């Protein structure tokens, strides 16, 4: 793409020398840039003044970019840094050589079914990794999918779309293209969960197979109506040669109700793979294998073993975690990673003599060796690459200091890739999920008084009467969406979710001067999917409450509570709430899910750490033994 008029090519933006304009959009401009301090080439996205001045967007972008920067998934373009320079927000990303999927489809037409499935499988892997960390993309579309010459696929713009409300996109007039892939719930007041990304991925699958999005219209109003009420199109009826089995895959992925869609993006990808004929399944596996082999660094040469006597030293680095095949949910990640120790007065240690732009920057957590920068022309920012090597494809001036580590990681990924190919070829039958926990078993899942006392460090806590209905006390919270992050089993929080039963107990020491107080509840849903969807929705709401103070009015009395940062991501989340003027009285909220049961716990006292989380974990263990 040529440098457009009024671009900032040739100028400095903080430490970045802006070398080439890659593209413009409603949210800002993207440049190829040289970081003059680190001496590497990156992609820098500069947000518009309207976005940069929006306090809600600023906070959400920082939070989402920080989370997205931790994603360790090869199909996610990593975010290196974020912050602002002279009041303008920016994101620094790896520069990737590739063409966006939208350009590929417009130039060459529909993909073959095996190639379409190979692309969708890679993007599904990126989405599942993000969803496991509690990150929604919110803008899955062909323009945000990069394809290399060897069909390695990347999903870009994590941390940007998630920070932008649908209302803001609409105001800027940039959502019309996005609306072609937006789930019905995003056009209503319904809660939006990670399954909106699955809907969008199904729309992209349809476009890969047929060459056109599911719904085409000249106006936004017609598009909205189609997503809300229009029949789901059948790819096999649009383009000859598409296996009819894809009709059911797209129909479930684009189901109007979120709970009727696939439980994960990987499940959609696996179903798409099953829709292929046997020869095409092998072809799709070959595409995946070739794309990985061509993109990952070559494995290092084997090093001969040392001749010195063996010692009892522990390995210097832990083994790399296994990559989960498409459609298989990964094991939950640890709910909390200890932060680096702060310096004096809570400040992070850093180099002296930092330039003026440094204090507002937000470096991402270390994630292993930084790969050699490649070229980034994503999200519709550049034309398809021309034949022959790019003029920018030169050896970087600074040598990667971690070649052995990167090579070792490449070996692991290549080996895992081979295992995935074998797994796809064998296609094991999915494990049948456990039967839902019966409502009459709920009370047996709660901790008894001795178990509660042991967790809380007390000896005299006693339970009250069993709770079998939601709390409908006339409580007013200044931020209604934060009520669930403050209290357990609230009727306004669970209303309309489809839950079927609740059982709970409140325990404390006798009298009004108790030092410990616990409210534990278990809530049954018709299916495990509905229970997980509720926890995901709750996690999104809780995270929006982090760092905020709410005023609570209860029986003519007013209280103020401040929320700490939310720890963990579904299936388990926790947050500590501190009551203002209560001499250190705090409560920890914990929510988890196992099978069709949501575990909802509130533990309060003067020395609260992770008691609610411990209680929730013990209840989850009981659910899993049912």
From Swiss-Prot:
Q: Name any one Pfam family assigned in the record.
A: PknH_C
Q: Which GO terms describe its molecular function?
A: ATP binding; protein serine kinase activity; protein serine/threonine kinase activity
UniProt entry keywords in alphabetical sequence:
ATP-binding, Cell membrane, Disulfide bond, Kinase, Membrane, Nucleotide-binding, Phosphoprotein, Serine/threonine-protein kinase, Stress response, Transferase, Transmembrane, Transmembrane helix
Positions in the Cytoplasmic compartment: 1-403
Query: Which reaction equation describes what this protein catalyses?
Result: L-seryl-[protein] + ATP = O-phospho-L-seryl-[protein] + ADP + H(+); L-threonyl-[protein] + ATP = O-phospho-L-threonyl-[protein] + ADP + H(+)
Cofactor needs = a divalent metal cation
List the subcellular locations. Answer: Cell membrane
Where are the bilayer-spanning segments? 404-424
Active site, renumbered: 139 (proton acceptor)
Instruction: Say yes or no: keyword Protein transport present.
Output: no
**Sorted alphabetically, which SMART domains does this protein's record hold?**
S_TKc
Any Gene Ontology biological process? regulation of primary metabolic process
Q: How does it sit in the membrane?
A: Single-pass membrane protein
What is this protein for, i.e. what is its function?
A: May regulate bacterial growth in response to external signals to facilitate adaptation to the host environment.
Q: What is this protein called?
A: Serine/threonine-protein kinase PknH
What is the organism of origin for this protein? Answer: Mycobacterium tuberculosis (strain CDC 1551 / Oshkosh)
